[in-house]
Amino acid sequence: MNPLSQSALVPLRKKAKMAPISQSFCQHNVKFKEIVLFLVERKMGSSRRTFLMELARKRGFQTEIELSDSVTHIVAENNSGAEVLEWLQSKKLGFTVKTHILDISWFTECMEAGRPVEIQNRHLLPVQQDCSANFNPPLSSSCVQVSQYACQRCTTLQDTNRIFTDAFDILAEHFEFCENKGRTVAFLRASSLIKSLPFPITAMKELEGLPWLGDQMKGIIEEILEEGKSYKVLEVMNEERYKSFKQFTSVFGVGLKTSDKWFRMGFRTLEEIKNEKELKLTKMQKCGLLYYEDITSYVSRAEAETTEQLIKSIVWKFVPDAIVTLTGGFRRGKKKGHDVDILITCARKGKEKNILHNTMSVLKNRGLLLFYNIIESTFDETKLPSRHVDALDHFQKCFTILKLPKRQMDIGNIIDPHECERKNWKAVRLDLVITPYEQYPYALLGWTGSRQFERDLRRYATHEKRMMLDNHGLYDKTKNNFLKANNEEDIFKQLGLDYLEPWERNA
């Protein structure tokens, strides 16, 4: 038996080197950096697995020979979710909450399309059902442990439970309109948690042990599972106050206080607001109504990147080494958004101070500004970071409505304001934020978002690390000093957190 056993081990040693695959990997360009594949060998076989991994690399995908924390998608063939978990356990391998466990059909469709395809429910291998007791799951009936903090969860744009998160987002918005902060935060937390789950919710038992899901949230989920909809959500969407506030707050320059004032005055629609000549509006609100159709339509990634290039071309004329960064949802990988946020700094101390006013002058002279409001810096370096998780920062900034030419080639050519009179442009909301270089990593982290991610990051710093974090810096209360950071990775490290890429922060 010994000679047979030894001979059987020989080819396994040769395969372990995997030199040809490693070399091949280096030869292929990676097109989809946000995706790392791991193919389960069980029922697939070594030869087929090697072939499929090489095929994926040729298509621009990253693959891992061994399962690691970098893996985002586990692909299995002819296996159930429970079987995959059992195989991982037998190999003493694990996976994180950010990992999708998928059937080979998803992989096949990706190879045919030459790009990652959207994950559908039919692609998912449920990991919640029939979980073996041998796995010793950390939660009562859940095979996935989920942190109460969004900054400890990977949340991509692939929301497999959108029917539930959309419902919670509507209810959160409803309570925000009612100025009920407690219930607003509760539904935002619940929505954020569900967005991070790597499996579709199909039964109530899958929710056991998960944080932030109270009886009311569970009741809504159960109703949707049984009825396909939530009557509470439908009731809210039909409420007169909700519908009016939804319209009012969509106007640039209109917040909750103004919406409440208009509602108490008897206004219910934007048409009524527009037709009331005696109503006093701020300049910002007038512009918001004047360019309402453009502003409320989505900004595409192409439009956001065109705006970024426009700002870069202007800023670099004054400060060639300035750092100009597109932030917000677009930095998190979104294909569309409501506005464009751009962060500007310079490594040479003090060089950033005149950038904003100079940039506004150029835009104004080119006839590309429909509205702008500059807010000067109110930062006080003697003060500690704010204790409030929703606190605004104190950077110099400008809120604008930009007249963006629809053809990118027009950007550098427009000098005469009259050239913009024809409607060959689109009104786009643009926020420019100027930050000192030493505060740039914190500003970049804060302006990248998402809102719930940043809220939980600050809460985590306060409650778990006795630190104070905002867009200006990180203060360690145990050492009574500010901590320096050269980049976002340093901030995560100082907080003792695993680094999450921007596209993993869509909480």
From Swiss-Prot:
<keyword id="KW-0460">Magnesium</keyword>
<dbReference type="GO" id="GO:0003887">
    <property type="term" value="F:DNA-directed DNA polymerase activity"/>
</dbReference>
<dbReference type="InterPro" id="IPR027292">
    <property type="entry name" value="TdT"/>
</dbReference>
<comment type="similarity">
    <text>Belongs to the DNA polymerase type-X family.</text>
</comment>
<feature type="binding site">
    <location>
        <position position="431"/>
    </location>
    <ligand>
        <name>Mg(2+)</name>
    </ligand>
</feature>
<dbReference type="InterPro" id="IPR018944">
    <property type="entry name" value="DNA_pol_lambd_fingers_domain"/>
</dbReference>
<dbReference type="InterPro" id="IPR027421">
    <property type="entry name" value="DNA_pol_lamdba_lyase_dom_sf"/>
</dbReference>
<feature type="binding site">
    <location>
        <begin position="338"/>
        <end position="341"/>
    </location>
    <ligand>
        <name>a 2'-deoxyribonucleoside 5'-triphosphate</name>
    </ligand>
</feature>
<dbReference type="InterPro" id="IPR036420">
    <property type="entry name" value="BRCT_dom_sf"/>
</dbReference>
<dbReference type="InterPro" id="IPR001357">
    <property type="entry name" value="BRCT_dom"/>
</dbReference>
<dbReference type="InterPro" id="IPR002054">
    <property type="entry name" value="DNA-dir_DNA_pol_X"/>
</dbReference>
<feature type="short sequence motif" description="Nuclear localization signal">
    <location>
        <begin position="11"/>
        <end position="17"/>
    </location>
</feature>
<feature type="domain" description="BRCT">
    <location>
        <begin position="27"/>
        <end position="124"/>
    </location>
</feature>
<dbReference type="GO" id="GO:0006304">
    <property type="term" value="P:DNA modification"/>
</dbReference>
<dbReference type="InterPro" id="IPR043519">
    <property type="entry name" value="NT_sf"/>
</dbReference>
<dbReference type="Pfam" id="PF14791">
    <property type="entry name" value="DNA_pol_B_thumb"/>
</dbReference>
<dbReference type="GO" id="GO:0046872">
    <property type="term" value="F:metal ion binding"/>
</dbReference>
<dbReference type="GO" id="GO:0003677">
    <property type="term" value="F:DNA binding"/>
</dbReference>
<protein>
    <recommendedName>
        <fullName>DNA nucleotidylexotransferase</fullName>
        <ecNumber>2.7.7.31</ecNumber>
    </recommendedName>
</protein>
<dbReference type="Pfam" id="PF00533">
    <property type="entry name" value="BRCT"/>
</dbReference>
<feature type="region of interest" description="Involved in DNA binding">
    <location>
        <begin position="254"/>
        <end position="258"/>
    </location>
</feature>
<dbReference type="Pfam" id="PF14716">
    <property type="entry name" value="HHH_8"/>
</dbReference>
<feature type="binding site">
    <location>
        <position position="339"/>
    </location>
    <ligand>
        <name>Mg(2+)</name>
    </ligand>
</feature>
<dbReference type="InterPro" id="IPR028207">
    <property type="entry name" value="DNA_pol_B_palm_palm"/>
</dbReference>
<feature type="binding site">
    <location>
        <begin position="329"/>
        <end position="334"/>
    </location>
    <ligand>
        <name>a 2'-deoxyribonucleoside 5'-triphosphate</name>
    </ligand>
</feature>
<dbReference type="GO" id="GO:0006303">
    <property type="term" value="P:double-strand break repair via nonhomologous end joining"/>
</dbReference>
<feature type="binding site">
    <location>
        <begin position="446"/>
        <end position="447"/>
    </location>
    <ligand>
        <name>a 2'-deoxyribonucleoside 5'-triphosphate</name>
    </ligand>
</feature>
<comment type="function">
    <text>Template-independent DNA polymerase which catalyzes the random addition of deoxynucleoside 5'-triphosphate to the 3'-end of a DNA initiator. One of the in vivo functions of this enzyme is the addition of nucleotides at the junction (N region) of rearranged Ig heavy chain and T-cell receptor gene segments during the maturation of B- and T-cells.</text>
</comment>
<keyword id="KW-0539">Nucleus</keyword>
<dbReference type="InterPro" id="IPR010996">
    <property type="entry name" value="DNA_pol_b-like_N"/>
</dbReference>
<keyword id="KW-0808">Transferase</keyword>
<feature type="binding site">
    <location>
        <position position="341"/>
    </location>
    <ligand>
        <name>Mg(2+)</name>
    </ligand>
</feature>
<dbReference type="GO" id="GO:0003912">
    <property type="term" value="F:DNA nucleotidylexotransferase activity"/>
</dbReference>
<dbReference type="InterPro" id="IPR029398">
    <property type="entry name" value="PolB_thumb"/>
</dbReference>
<dbReference type="InterPro" id="IPR001726">
    <property type="entry name" value="TdT/Mu"/>
</dbReference>
<dbReference type="Pfam" id="PF10391">
    <property type="entry name" value="DNA_pol_lambd_f"/>
</dbReference>
<keyword id="KW-0548">Nucleotidyltransferase</keyword>
<dbReference type="GO" id="GO:0005634">
    <property type="term" value="C:nucleus"/>
</dbReference>
<dbReference type="GO" id="GO:0006259">
    <property type="term" value="P:DNA metabolic process"/>
</dbReference>
<keyword id="KW-0780">Terminal addition</keyword>
<dbReference type="InterPro" id="IPR022312">
    <property type="entry name" value="DNA_pol_X"/>
</dbReference>
<dbReference type="InterPro" id="IPR037160">
    <property type="entry name" value="DNA_Pol_thumb_sf"/>
</dbReference>
